[in-house]
Curated annotation (Swiss-Prot):
The keyword tRNA-binding does not apply. GO terms for cellular component: cytosol. SUPFAM superfamilies: Chaperone J-domain, HSP40/DnaJ peptide-binding domain. This is DnaJ homolog subfamily B member 5. Residues 4-68 form the J domain. PROSITE patterns: DNAJ_1, DNAJ_2. GO terms for molecular function: protein-folding chaperone binding; unfolded protein binding. Keywords: Chaperone. InterPro entries: DnaJ_C, DnaJ_domain, DnaJ_domain_CS, DnaJ_subfamily_B, HSP40/DnaJ_pept-bd, J_dom_sf. It comes from the Eukaryota. Pfam families: DnaJ (PF00226), DnaJ_C (PF01556). One of its GO terms (biological process) is chaperone cofactor-dependent protein refolding.
Length: 348
């Protein structure tokens, strides 16, 4: 003999739509496995979901009333009648039915809801909570002293609101880049491991994903590249954004100052006094001869215009290559050299 869906929900066969919803709400809350620890609660919870799935749909209910469970699922009655090509199969996930009915995958979120959300909880109607005290599906929570749910004299229920999902804080990673990568532009591949929701909306899986990070020419240190909602996902959160923050790698020859590049040129005292030509390397691998005919004092700066990094908003324009001179003095002088310098160098 097939299942009696009306009996499972505890309603007469002539029950209307509101009575069916009311019965499902009461029975589902009573037998939800998170609240009911009886051995058969899970199976009972599944039967309740299947009964509601059939009786809440006019087409399925009509076929069930005419042919029973067997006829509904096989497409025809035992007496040879036909219900057409429709064959019903329960999807098998009572938690999905519960989540769809109550508007959330966590069955008891409604009891810890706050006033943060202005949207009423669509699956809960206080007027429908007319269960007896001994059959109260929420009675087990009374011993924890939750506000409004403790056992004792009953009072008028207050409107409840769903707990709004809140996005997790951003997950920030430092991304080190060379000045050459900033000069030319580049694309980096970063592998992240994160948790994602399965199709049932409740369980999670771990998966890897490759993020392609496009670094545009001239981007400054501190620039943020954001991948929205690529963080861990759970039934109760909005995934965090993954954020990469650019950080300049130390360079063997150069230092960065915005779009300008600084280079320290070390010359001897003789070169500083007598003049020289200094070969200055550039970011793109060239060498520029820089004639120095005047006396070079320690800290002297010369500027090679347009040899720096691209401007972020106008990559065709570039900053400057700034050469800072350092003079290497000898550790000691011979008496003869000292005498010559005294004779030829000015006193001031």
């Amino acid at each position: 003999m097939g299942k009696d869906y009306y009996k499972i929900l505890g309603i007469p066969s002539g029950a209307n739509e509101d009575e069916i919803k009311k019965a499902y709400r009461k029975m589902a809350l009573k037998y939800h496995p998170d609240k009911n620890k009886e051995p058969n609660a899970e199976e009972k919870f599944k039967e309740i979901a299947e009964a509601y799935d059939v009786l809440s749909d006019p087409k399925k209910r009509g076929l069930y009333d005419q042919y029973g469970e067997e006829g509904l699922k096989t497409g025809g009655g035992s007496s040879g009648g036909s219900s057409g090509s429709f064959h019903y199969t329960f999807h098998g996930d009572p938690h999905a039915t519960f989540a769809s009915f109550f508007g959330g995958s966590n069955p008891f979120d409604i009891f810890f809801a706050s006033s943060r959300s202005a949207r009423p909880f669509s699956g809960f109607d206080p007027d429908d909570m007319d269960v007896d005290e001994d059959d109260d599906p929420f009675g087990a929570f009374g011993r924890f002293g939750f506000n409004g749910l403790s056992r004792g004299p009953r009072r008028a229920p207050e409107p409840l609101y769903p707990r709004r999902k809140v996005q997790d804080p951003p997950v920030v990673h430092e991304l080190r880049v060379s000045l050459e990568e900033i000069y030319h532009g580049s694309t980096k591949r970063m592998k992240i491991t994160r948790r994602r929701l399965n199709p049932d909306g409740r369980t999670v899986r771990t998966e890897d994903k490759i993020l392609h990070i496009v670094i545009k020419r001239g981007w400054k240190e501190g620039t943020k590249i954001t991948f929205p909602k690529e963080g861990d996902a759970t039934p109760d959160n909005i995934p965090a954004d993954i954020v990469f923050v650019l950080k300049d790698k130390p360079h063997a020859h150069f230092r960065r100052d915005g779009t300008n590049v600084l280079y320290s040129a070390l010359i001897s005292l003789k070169e500083a006094l007598c003049g020289c030509t200094v070969n200055i390397p550039t970011i793109d691998g060239r060498v520029i001869p820089l004639p120095c005919n005047d006396v070079i004092k320690p800290g002297t700066v010369k500027r090679l215009r347009g040899e720096g990094l691209p401007f972020p908003k106008v990559p065709t324009q570039r900053g400057d290559l700034i050469v800072e001179f350092k003079v290497r003095f000898p550790d000691r002088l011979t008496p003869q050299t000292r005498q010559i310098l005294k004779q030829h160098l000015p006193c001031s």
